């Protein structure tokens, strides 16, 4: 661990067979799950695949926000708090749920891509492929935006895992 890795909030994690993993935690699709929970509080049901398809069809500039903002780490009214964070950046807040979902997924993709670039730089390695695992690997919009933002190939799966 160096001062540079500490500043980047990167650490080492012991693993199987004496392996050590370079690690940086990034907020995940919990931002989307909590936003949906807020929207469903009125008793309505959100069709997630349909909402993600609508988000994929959103055109024009998509506002990005820092997905790891500590103000977004607690549950409750997350869509409202995300909108406030976007507004603070001076970007227009999406007027639709699909627009906000696109912003959430694009912001996560940017955070993931930035993490991969940072870890590659700190490790002195060129990264060619991102393996996206866990439930997010089923989200084709996330996979595509991550590939677009990182410039790398994204391999999706397995679903039964929780690390990038």
Please tell me what each predicted stretch does.
Residues 1-130, 138-162:
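Active-site core segments that coordinate phosphate-bearing ligands/cofactors
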């Amino acid at each position: 661990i160096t001062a540079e890795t500490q500043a980047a909030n990167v650490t080492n994690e012991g693993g199987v067979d004496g392996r050590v993993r370079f690690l940086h935690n990034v907020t995940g699709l919990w931002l989307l799950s909590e936003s949906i929970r807020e929207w469903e509080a009125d008793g309505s049901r959100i069709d997630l695949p349909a909402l993600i398809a609508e988000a994929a069809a959103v055109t024009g500039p998509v506002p990005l926000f820092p997905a790891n903002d500590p103000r977004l780490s607690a549950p409750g009214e997350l869509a409202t708090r995300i909108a406030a964070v976007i507004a603070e950046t001076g970007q227009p807040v999406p007027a639709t749920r699909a627009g906000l979902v696109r912003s959430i997924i694009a912001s996560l993709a940017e955070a993931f891509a930035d993490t991969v670039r940072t870890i590659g730089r700190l490790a002195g390695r060129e990264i060619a492929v991102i393996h996206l695992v866990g439930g997010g690997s089923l989200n084709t919009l996330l996979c595509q935006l991550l590939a677009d933002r990182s410039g790398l190939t994204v391999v999706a799966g397995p679903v039964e895992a929780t690390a990038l």
